[in-house]
């Protein structure tokens, strides 16, 4: 059976995350968005985004990486300004899907 492999990174907000000002959070968020924009441009991330209204509010986001190893996905995740500030705690795992399964677009929303 032919499959495509991604590395799924779950981003958890630790209970003991550092306290930051609104300005610091805004700066980190801008860097976070730029980091993932760049990873998508480099074809290292297939897609990523926030997670809301789930059973565990500490799960804040996820990313599907196109890397050769879990270690590489983790390294790219930890290069994110938010991760360097110890806001998300990443968990990396394999994710397999049928070839071409990720080509369908999602439903458009406006936030």
Q: Where does each model-flagged region fall?
A:
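Conserved, structured core segments of small domains
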Residues: 1-111
């Amino acid at each position: 059976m032919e499959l495509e492999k991604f590395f799924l990174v779950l981003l958890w907000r630790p209970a003991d995350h550092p306290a930051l000002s609104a300005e610091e959070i805004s700066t980190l968020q801008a860097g976070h968005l730029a980091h993932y924009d760049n990873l998508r441009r480099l074809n290292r991330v297939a897609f990523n985004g926030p997670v809301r209204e789930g059973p565990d509010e500490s799960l804040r986001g996820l990313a599907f990486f196109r890397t050769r190893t879990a270690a590489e996905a983790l390294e790219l995740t930890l290069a994110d300004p938010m991760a360097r500030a110890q806001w998300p705690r990443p968990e990396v795992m394999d994710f397999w899907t049928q070839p071409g399964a990720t080509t369908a677009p999602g439903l458009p929303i406006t936030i």
